Amino acid sequence: MPLNRRQFLATTSMAAAVSAFNRRALGATAPQAAQAPPGTSFVPVRGTIGIFNGQGGTIGWHVDPHAVAIIDAQFPATAKICLEGIDQRSGSRPIDYLVNTHHHADHTSGNPVFRPVTRTILAQANEPRLQLEAAARAAAAVKPGSPPPPAPVVANATYEKAWRKPVGTEVMALNYYGPAHTSGDSVITFEKAEVVHMGDLVFNRLHPYIDKPAGASIANWIRSLEAIAGEHPKSAIFVYGHANPKFGPTGSAADLLAMRDYLTALLEFVRGQVKAGKPREAILAIVEPLPGFPDQGPLVPRVLSAAYEEVAG
């Protein structure tokens, strides 16, 4: 039985204050949280679907008189703000589904805020294991004498390849396209509204995080983006986990194809450097923008390293 929402939110105020822990607790290599939460906003997208901008990956939401679904959880401080706003929109209905698009800290650290008022936390089958492994690494790295991090809250329901159910007046579908950003990325489609939450499969005109230790595959990421773009109507609106402010966290299939082209160019660029005989250290030191992709800015070691690993083996 979910707690009274107001009582629960009051008890989480202090927990939110320690949210800085999450940068280590659920994967130190995941995108980092700022020291102080930035401004937050609720933005309608289409129909019953909207997004919440705060600290971490973009949260998606569906609220109608019969059901509530949330996509991703950010960090505790902004998860609390998000939950308060969802309360206002839903009349404090229990949350039917919280979906984690993948395991990274900036998408799952807010799970403890949502858990007491959520019936089901849903993710791709690989995601809970990846989240627990990241938490174990973080716990092992805690200095002697320091308090251990709290245990992560992981999905209590999973799917392998596809999942689809009515959620109030909507139909929510989850699909897994194989290894890409990680090896547990979900794409969430609200079929009636034609809104598709991509999680971190799209960093809109930003250099992405490519989590090789978690099974990422640039080559399959490229194939996945092309498939997703082709499977949805031209009128679909896509939601992105992270975005260059100049371009924003929502857009069209053209953004997916731009991300596909960026990843293709990244692999080809690094492959060319390897064929030219450049050592890994020299490749990782390249800072010029990737040719044809000035909006992402100078190249950074994290993308070059992932591409090198995929090209050179």
What is each PLM-predicted segment?
Residues 22-52:
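C-terminal segment of N-terminal export signals and the immediately downstream linker at the start
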Residues 88-164:
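Active-site HxH/HxHxD metal-binding segment of metal-dependent hydrolases
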Residues 9, 275-313:
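C-terminal regulatory/interaction regions
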Residues 71-73, 96-103, 122-125, 197-199, ...:
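Active-site neighborhood of phospho(di)ester-bond hydrolases with catalytic His/Asp-centered motifs
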Residues 1-16:
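N-terminal secretory signal peptides and thylakoid transit peptides that target proteins
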